[in-house]
A protein has these predicted regions:
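Extended, charge-rich alpha-helical interface modules
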Residues: 2-67
Length: 67
C-alpha cells in the first residue's frame, strides 16, 4: 500500500515538473516580451528542456518499479 502511494506521488511530481516547464517554455517562445527580466532566452529555454528531459527519464525509470 505505501509502496503504491510513494510511486504514485513520484509520478505526479515528475508529471507536474514536465507540465510546469512546458508551460513556461511555451510562454517564453510565444510571448518573449513577458519575460524581459530574462535576457538569456536561449539559456533559459535550454534549462527548461533539460528539466523536461530529466523528469521524462525519471518517469521511464519509475515504470520499472511499478511492475
Amino acid at each position: 500500500m505505501f509502496r503504491r502511494l510513494i510511486l504514485d506521488a513520484l509520478e505526479d511530481r515528475y508529471n507536474a515538473q514536465i507540465s510546469e516547464a512546458e508551460a513556461t517554455l511555451k510562454i517564453y517562445l510565444e510571448k518573449p516580451v513577458a519575460i524581459g527580466e530574462h535576457p538569456q532566452h536561449v539559456d533559459e529555454a535550454d534549462r527548461l528542456i533539460e528539466k523536461i528531459s530529466t523528469a521524462e527519464e525519471k518517469l521511464r525509470t519509475l515504470q520499472a518499479f511499478k511492475l
